[in-house]
């Protein structure tokens, strides 16, 4: 790749709602735009999902399409296609504490009265648990319906409140993201975790859609190490990037 205009500047992107519509595949136009953006600045992506799910959205070559690819908030880190770091929830918490948390959560979901339930209520990832009251096996239509229902009935915020109080001794962070679930991970394992790999950059611009308190982009958006930008859609992301990096 030819020398970039601003190699010391990093543009770092959330995935869901920022580069793609929620849980949808990236458009060819957006992929082409990101390719053009790499001619101007260094580019990275950071998502809460594991690498398999991020690859489903951004393509199988995601670790080489961007200079940095951080899955599970950076707990699994790639630079130029090479794995540069991993961290494990199991080794950090231990099986006994994990089991206690999972058992309580499944009991809570079992007693939850919501219109529908499907399957995969807890997804165990290397660096976090993803908890979904409706279950991740639901269809896109069911996802959309649950998101509307949750906005009225606060199913996820209420559940997070109960779990936060019950497991205060574990020092966990609860982060509501996407349409149907929330992530659970040790304090400090939010998206700011990936910043440890980015010390060389003088300027880091972060783009995300859930930048409000409690959203899974909040901590990195507010970090002293980043310049935060709230976006509303992939089109808005592209528009802001054009204005910031490509208009000079």
From Swiss-Prot:
Cell location: Cytoplasm
Leading EC class: isomerase
Record: residues binding Mg(2+) 1: 14, 16, 209
Keyword Nucleus in record: no
Catalytic activity: alpha-D-mannose 1-phosphate = D-mannose 6-phosphate
UniProt-recorded Gene Ontology molecular function terms: metal ion binding; phosphomannomutase activity
Assigned GO CC terms: cytosol
Domain of life, per lineage: Eukaryota
InterPro entries given in the database record: HAD-like_sf, HAD-SF_hydro_IIB, HAD_sf, PMM, PMM_cap
A Pfam family of this chain: PMM
Catalytic residues (positions): 14, 16
EC number: 5.4.2.8
Pathway(s) this gene product operates in, as recorded in its UniProt entry: Nucleotide-sugar biosynthesis; GDP-alpha-D-mannose biosynthesis; alpha-D-mannose 1-phosphate from D-fructose 6-phosphate: step 2/2
Sorted UniProt keywords: Cytoplasm, Isomerase, Magnesium, Metal-binding
Keyword match Magnesium: yes
Cofactor dependence: Mg(2+)
Assembly and binders: Homodimer.
Family as reported in the entry's similarity comment: Belongs to the eukaryotic PMM family.
PANTHER family named in the record: PHOSPHOMANNOMUTASE
Role description: Catalyzes the interconversion of mannose-6-phosphate to mannose-1-phosphate, the precursor for the synthesis of GDP-mannose. GDP-mannose is an essential sugar nucleotide for the synthesis of D-mannose-containing cell wall polysaccharides (galactomannans and glucomannans), glycolipids, glycoproteins and the antioxidant L-ascorbate.
Protein name: Phosphomannomutase
Organism: Oryza sativa subsp. indica (Rice)
